[in-house]
Amino acid sequence: MAEIHDITGLLKPYLSGTNLVWTLLLVGYIIPKLFQYLQRLFSPVSRIPGSWLHKLTSLPLKIAIAKGESHIFTVDLHKKYGPIVTLSPTMISISDAREIKRIVHTEDWAKSEAVYGNFRQDPQRPTLLAFTDKKAYSQRKRLVSSMFGLRYIRSMQPLMRNCISVLMDELDKQCANGATAVDMQHMIQSLAADIIGVTTFGQTFDLVKNGSHPLPDRLKQALKLSGILQFMPWLTKIPFIPNRDPYVSWFTNEIVAKRRAQIASRQGPPREDLLQKMIEAADESPTSPFRVSDIQDESVVLLIAGSETTANAELFTLIHLLRHPSKLATLYEEIDRWYPRNDPRPTDCDYSMSGMVYLQACIDETMRLVPGQATGSPRESRKDETLLGYDIPKGTTVFPTTQEVHLDETLWPNATEFLPERWLDVYAKGEANSLPYYPFSAGSRVCIGKHFAAQEMHLSLVSLLRRFQFEYVSGQDESTVFRIAQQMRGHRYLMTVGRR
C-alpha cells in the first residue's frame, strides 16, 4: 500500500488541471509523433533524393494537391533532385522510362491502396477505376468489357454524331454574321457531357443547347473534391461532407429505376447504351460481384472520366493547332482529302479513322505534351522492391510520372515542341506501342474507355474542322491544374470561329 501511495504522490502533480491536459497531449500525441518522425528518418524512403521536409511530412504534397498543382510540384522536384524523388514519407515519384515501363507494364504493379482506397463511394465495393486487388479487378473488367469492345463502340457513332450536330448548329448560329469569338472550352466540355449522357444514360443533358445542367455541374465539383479526398481521406469523417452528392445519387438512382421498370414491362426494344448493358449484367444475389448499386457508382465514374478527360484532350489539341497555323493548314488539307468540301458523307470512323494519320499524330502529340494523367496512375509496391538502386519498402506508393517521361529530351528530341510529324514515321514502322508513351496508362490497367475516347475525338474534331475555321485568340490564361485529370485552370477559353 505504501508503494501505491508513493506512486500516486509522484503522479499527482500531473493529474490535476492544466497539467493533466499537457500530460495527455504529451502521451497521446507528441511522443507518438516523435516516434513516427524517428521511424521516417530511418526508413529506406529517407535515403531517396528529395527535401528533408517531404521525408517527414506529407503537408507540402497535400497543399499542392489542394491547389491543383501536384503536377507542377512533381516536375519541380524532378528538376532539382533527378529521376527518383520523395513526395511524402510514404510516396515517391519516378521519371525513368525503363522503371516506369517495368512498373506499369512488365510487372504491372497494383494500384495504390493509399490513393485509390479513398476513391470509392462504397469502401467495400470499388468501381473499375478504384480496384486495387488484381483478381477482383479482372472479374469486374470481364463483366463490362463487352461494353467497351470496338464493335459496340462503333454502334454508338449515330448517337455521338447527333450530339455533334447540335454543337455544329449552335456554332452556325453564333457565327452567322461572320467570324466571332466563342468560348470553345465550354462548348467542347458541354459536347462531351452530352455524348456521355446519351451513350451512358440514353438521354442528352442538352448542355450545348441550354448552357447548363445540374448533373454535370455537380460532377465538376465532385471532381475537385475527389482529387483532394484521395490524399486527405480524413475529410470524409467531417459530418457535413457526404460520401455521395445527394443530387447525383438521386439522379442516377432515378435513371436506373426507370430503365429497370422499362425492361421489366418490356416497353419497346432494348436501348443501345451503356446503362442497358450494365443493368443486363447486374445480379442482386448475395455473392454477386456486380449489383444494381454498383451501376450508380460506375455511371458516375463514366460521367466524370469519360467527359472531362476526352474534352480536355480535344480542347488542348485545338489550342496547339491554333498556336501553329502551318500544322492546322496541313490538317485541313488531310480532312479535305478524306471529306471533300460539301461532301454529304457523315464523318465515319470506319471510313477515315485509320487513314487520317496526321490528325492522329496531332492528338498523340497533344496527349504527349499535356497528358491527362500528368503524374501517372499511382502504383504500390506489394513487396520490398528496388528502383534505380534505392530500396523501396513494401506498401510504398509510387507515381510513374507520365509528364516527365513524355518530355524527356533523350527519348523525344525537341520534347517541348508541338511536332505531330514525329509520329508519322512511328506509325509507318508500327512502333507506336513500343514508345514510352502512356496517355491511357498501360498493362492490365490500361484505360478501358480508350477506344470510346478515340472515336469521340475523331468524330468531334473532324466534324468541327470540316465546317469551321478556327483562329487563335492571344492573351488568355493557358496554365493547367491537375484534379484527377489535367485541365485548364480557367473556366473559359475563346477561339475565333467562322464558317469555312
Curated annotation (Swiss-Prot):
Localization per Swiss-Prot or TrEMBL: Membrane
Enzyme class: oxidoreductase
Enzyme Commission number(s) from the entry: 1.-.-.-
Top-level taxon of origin: Eukaryota
UniProt key word Repeat: no
Pfam families hit by this protein: p450
Phenotype of gene-disrupted mutants: Abolishes the production of acurin A.
A single GO molecular function term of this UniProt record: heme binding
Keyword Cytoplasm applies: no
Residue ranges of the TM segments: 13-32
Function comment: Cytochrome P450 monooxygenase; part of the cluster that mediates the biosynthesis of acurin A, a highly reduced polyketide coupled to a serine via a peptide bond. The activities of the highly reducing polyketide synthase acrA and the nonribosomal peptide synthetase acrB are collectively responsible for the synthesis of the acurin A core structure with a heptaketide backbone produced by acrA covalently fused to a L-serine by acrB. After the formation of the PK-NRP hybrid product, it is detached from acrB by reductive release to set up the formation of the lactam ring by aldol condensation.
Keywords, ordered alphabetically: Glycoprotein, Heme, Iron, Membrane, Metal-binding, Monooxygenase, Oxidoreductase, Transmembrane, Transmembrane helix
Protein name as catalogued: Cytochrome P450 monooxygenase acrD
Cofactor(s) for this UniProt protein: heme
Native source organism of the sequence: Aspergillus aculeatus (strain ATCC 16872 / CBS 172.66 / WB 5094)
Gene Ontology CC terms: membrane
Upregulation: Expression is positively regulated by the acurin A cluster-specific transcription regulator acrR.
Lineage, opening ranks: Eukaryota, Fungi, Dikarya, Ascomycota, Pezizomycotina
Functional pathway: Secondary metabolite biosynthesis
Membrane topology category: Single-pass membrane protein
UniProt cross-references to Gene3D superfamilies, sorted A to Z: Cytochrome P450
Chain sites annotated for binding heme: C447
